[in-house]
């Protein structure tokens, strides 16, 4: 819907659309950690009496999150970091955060919680296990390779872009950390 905003230049629209993709991926990841595969919402919906969306597999959910982050990171208008002069944009997602979140998602997905020869939970009902909504269905070593490659890509980009860090507290007090958190 950002395309319909009047008096906003195309660069800002593309930046905000990329940020929105990172936000969606981060919210999906929060849910994924608790529930595994999720219904994938890829379009806007009108008011309807029912939304019958099937639950996706773990693999489909991870792919959806990673694809969103790849699309966001490939957007030239999404900056690597915000810098100190960009105070109007503080607290926003950046290319670095998109690439870092991708690493975190792939690491979590490759972990034994989802990637093992035996499902994490063996208690009935087993519908989610059988449908691969809470695990991959078998151990897949290539998931570790995907995670490793995402980390290599992140650190390669980090070297080319220079230094990157999270906001640091200016003083080691509760108020100093609170101020850094609120930036």
Please report, for each region that a protein language model flagged, where it lies by residue.
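Conserved, well-structured interaction surfaces
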Residues: 1-35, 49-90
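Short coil/turn and helix-start
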Residues: 7-11, 40, 141
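An aromatic- and glycine-enriched ligand-binding surface/loop that stacks and positions planar moieties
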Residues: 38, 70-71, 76, 92-99, ...
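Outer-membrane beta-barrel translocator domains and adjoining extracellular loop/strand segments
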Residues: 42-45
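A sequence-level detector of short, solvent-exposed, charge-rich linear segments
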Residues: 47-51, 121-122
């Amino acid at each position: 819907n950002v395309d319909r905003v009047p008096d906003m230049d195309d660069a800002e629209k593309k930046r905000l659309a990329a940020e929105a993709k990172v936000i969606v991926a981060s919210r999906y990841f929060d849910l994924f950690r608790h529930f595994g595969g999720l219904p994938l919402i890829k379009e806007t919906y009108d008011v309807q009496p029912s939304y019958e969306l099937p639950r996706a597999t773990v693999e489909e959910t991870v792919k959806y999150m990673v694809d969103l982050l790849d699309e966001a990171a490939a957007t030239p208008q999404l900056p690597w970091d915000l810098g100190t002069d960009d105070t109007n944009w503080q607290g926003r997602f950046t290319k670095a955060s998109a690439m870092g979140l991708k690493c975190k998602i792939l690491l979590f997905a490759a972990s034994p919680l989802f990637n093992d020869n035996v499902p994490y939970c063996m208690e009935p009902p087993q519908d989610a296990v059988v449908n691969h909504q809470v695990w991959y269905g078998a151990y897949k070593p290539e998931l570790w390779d995907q995670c490793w490659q995402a980390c290599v890509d992140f650190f390669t980009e980090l070297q080319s872009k220079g230094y990157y860090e999270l906001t640091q507290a200016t003083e080691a007090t509760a108020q100093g950390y609170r101020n850094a958190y609120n930036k």
